[in-house]
């Protein structure tokens, strides 16, 4: 059924005289190479004429047809009669000139090319069309609406598209691009503001650091001055204390050198009294003259002597000056009263006896 259908209705792949030419080739006897060789020797000119006729015939009929279909499968050619490469090259231009159609010849290509949604560019125009430039009035109107609100609602988008004569997609894409530019400008403005603030803070920080360094230098200078002043004051205090000590010592030395010792007068009267006593009472019966107190104490009596301890007890017990009696060889000698001041001087003299104190006792013993 399929082979009859193919035979009855010629396909667009094959030329119109394809079946007739194929039948003529099958009816023609096979070509003998020996006869061809003999004919080449005897009638070369006639063979050349036949070749020209065959070429004209092939040119008139077109390229040679493909081999007959396979006996079992009519769509496959037989393996014994496969066409050569040159025959296929000759058929290629004819196949390319005719359109390819399947079945009833519908518009499959049109459906592929025209089916689906139309691809639009960024400004809303189709991919094949040129981009539509907005005029000045449209841009101004869109800018005003963008200033009112950068977000575009569907109703507002439709109104703007109708008012400006644009597609809603064009309006939406313009708003989207405008928002992107606005964000970029805002970022640039924020960056510039932050950069100015950073520069100001850096300058202020540098000024504060310089001021801090100056203050630290002043503190170090003040500390050095305070240390120097404290050292100077300490030196002055030590010098003043040393000078005061030297002045006090000099005053003490002057006082000591100016004031005579308290028992100097008693020491001066001691030798004179000794000479008077020695000259007047040689035989023991001299007159009863006044003699110094210490000489009477040191001189022994005939009947009994007065001890120094008794003298001290008597001086501390009596209110007035003590009176002592000296029994000489011939008469009684009454001792003069001694006041408290002279007695104190005597005690001082006893504490520090001079090396040249004369003791008259050896004279009496002799």
Swiss-Prot record:
It is found in: Nucleus. Residues 185-229 are annotated as: Leucine-zipper. Residues 25-81, 94-132, 239-287, 312-336 are annotated as: Disordered. Residues 103-115 have a biased composition (Gly residues). PROSITE patterns: HOMEOBOX_1 (PS00027), HOMEOBOX_2 (PS50071). Its main location: nucleus. Belongs to the HD-ZIP homeobox family. Class I subfamily. This is Homeobox-leucine zipper protein HOX21. It comes from Oryza sativa subsp. japonica (Rice). The lineage of its organism: Eukaryota, Viridiplantae, Streptophyta, Embryophyta, Tracheophyta.
């Amino acid at each position: 059924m399929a082979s009859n259908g193919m035979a009855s209705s010629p396909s667009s792949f094959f030329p119109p005289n394809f079946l007739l030419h194929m039948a003529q080739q099958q009816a023609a006897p096979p070509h003998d190479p020996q006869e061809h060789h003999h004919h080449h020797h005897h009638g070369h000119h006639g063979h050349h004429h036949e070749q020209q006729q065959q070429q004209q015939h092939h040119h008139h009929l077109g390229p040679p047809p493909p081999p007959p279909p396979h006996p079992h499968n009519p769509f496959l050619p037989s393996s014994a009669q496969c066409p050569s490469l040159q025959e296929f090259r000759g058929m290629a231009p004819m196949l390319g000139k005719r359109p390819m159609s399947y079945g009833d010849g519908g518009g499959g290509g049109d459906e592929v090319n025209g089916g689906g949604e139309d691809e639009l560019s960024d400004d809303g125009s189709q991919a094949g069309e040129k981009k539509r430039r907005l005029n000045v009035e449209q841009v101004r109107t869109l800018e005003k609406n963008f200033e009112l609100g950068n977000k575009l609602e569907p109703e507002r988008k439709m109104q703007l598209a109708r008012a400006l004569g644009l597609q809603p997609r064009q309006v939406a894409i313009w708003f989207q691009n405008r928002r992107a530019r606005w964000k970029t400008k805002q970022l640039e403005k924020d960056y510039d503001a932050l950069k100015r603030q950073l520069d100001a803070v850096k300058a202020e920080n540098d000024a504060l650091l310089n001021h801090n360094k100056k203050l630290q230098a002043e503190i170090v200078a003040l500390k050095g001055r305070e240390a120097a002043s404290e050292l100077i004051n300490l030196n002055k205090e030590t010098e003043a204390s040393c000078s005061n000590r030297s002045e006090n010592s000099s005053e003490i030395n002057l006082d000591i050198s100016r004031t005579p010792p308290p028992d100097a007068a008693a020491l001066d009267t001691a030798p004179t009294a000794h000479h008077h006593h020695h000259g007047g009472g040689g035989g023991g019966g001299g007159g009863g003259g006044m003699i110094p107190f210490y000489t009477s104490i040191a001189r022994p009596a005939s009947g009994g002597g007065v001890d120094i301890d008794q003298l001290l007890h008597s001086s501390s017990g009596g209110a007035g000056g003590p009176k002592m009696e000296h029994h000489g060889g011939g008469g009684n000698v009454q001792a003069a009263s001694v006041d408290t001041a002279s007695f104190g001087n005597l005690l001082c003299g006893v504490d520090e006896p001079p090396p040249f104190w004369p003791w008259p006792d050896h004279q009496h013993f002799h």
